[in-house]
Amino acid sequence: MSKIIGKIGRLPKTLYEHKKKTIFFSFLGYLGADWVYRWDRNQGIRKEYAKIAVKYGETTVSPETRPKRVFVLVNVEGNSRGCFDQFNKNALPLFHLAGVQVDVVKADNQAQLEALAGAVDTQEADILYVVGGDGTIGTVVTGIFRNREKAQLPVGFYPGGYDNLWLKRMLPSVFENSDDVRHACETAMAVIEDQKKSVYAFELTTEGSTLAPEYGLGDVSAGWFRQIEDTRKKFWYFSMAKRRWAYFWEMLKRGPAPIECHVEYEETCAGCEKCRPKPIIEAPQWRWWHVLTGTPKYKNNDGQKDYTGIINEKCGEKHELDTHGAEFLIENEQMSDYSQIRFRMGGTDIGRFGVISDGFKRCSEGIVGRSTDEKFYGTDFLANSVAFKISALPSYIHRLYISSNATPKDAELTDRQITIRGTQKKLDIFLPTSIRLEL
């Protein structure tokens, strides 16, 4: 007993003499305790959502009622292939408890993902549920609208990406704080509870390309900030400081040479007889009983608004400008029955310290993909369509991020006109309205 007491008494001296080891093992102990705390908290969250989901599964229905069929399309490469494991923990059990029929299909590559998204229809499922991040969403939306004029199924999204920028823009109150699994569970509950919203895709075409147009819901971006955010992943060993270190390290090595481009854009219009075609109304089919009931009524199957008589003199008006900066961002803004384009270019004449300063502000507020300072963007306008031609793009940032999918390093991006336009291509999506569980 005296030996044990003696060792305890010498412990402070031992720790003092081995400062480096003490600091190292203390840090490991902190990380271990934090992991245990987060694991226990997430287990409790999953349990509470399971209690809600099982109530739907225990609801009495007719034997003839077919269960809701969900076709789960998984990008196995999403977020270093970790998103599928998280889906299995957070969303799949809720579907099973709610009595939902689930079919899971894994796509091995982007081409397969696009093909499957375009092929699935009401014969196989009632709902398409996509597991992946921003790039996966862009690929799925492209697959749907390259193969069909209209989407056949409503779509749900599991936030399996590294940043999930589009979901954060659509519903920041749910997806901005992703320290726990509540936001992931809510996406499954939105499908179970049939919480739907209509969104509209953008269309992107490239001059001289033989490929069909690309479609997406998120944004198109390029620049120093986007490149630095992309490289931060390799600094994982800096843990919570990896973003700040990425900004400091990249600006220590090189200065932010500007992007230069020429922009042509078309004035935005909420709808007029010039830009909105008159709705196509199919002639009704006659049946013998119409002799007794009268002439059948014409029906607008799409429920489209008729803009005949509405005149907007600025509709289709085109403008041109030359702009330059450290970051440009093109966002798909959702309107009532269409989407429009928001073009922003910022960081004009910004230096190394300016990039670090603005980057640190983004880190402090947990924002990725855009500046927290609205004055940062010297060029900012809304348009029906935007056509831009990049004349200067530094070699280190020679990439265009389309729905967070980066173009290859050897892609021809300069002196080629790229056109992005808002569309009326509608997609019904499942989106939670709020986080129901308070911690």
From Swiss-Prot:
GO molecular function: acylglycerol kinase activity; ATP-dependent diacylglycerol kinase activity; ceramide kinase activity; D-erythro-sphingosine kinase activity
GO biological process: ceramide biosynthetic process; sphingosine biosynthetic process
Residues in DAGKc domain copies: 65-208
Pfam families associated with the record: DAGK_cat (PF00781)
One Gene Ontology cellular component annotation held by this UniProt entry: mitochondrion
InterPro entries (UniProt xref): ATP-NAD_kinase_N, Diacylglycerol_kinase_cat_dom, Lipid_Phosphate_FormReg, NAD/diacylglycerol_kinase_sf
The organism's place on the tree of life at top rank: Eukaryota
PANTHER family hit by this protein: ACYLGLYCEROL KINASE, MITOCHONDRIAL (PTHR12358:SF31), SPHINGOSINE KINASE (PTHR12358)
UniProt name for this protein: Uncharacterized protein F52C9.3
Lineage: Eukaryota, Metazoa, Ecdysozoa, Nematoda, Chromadorea
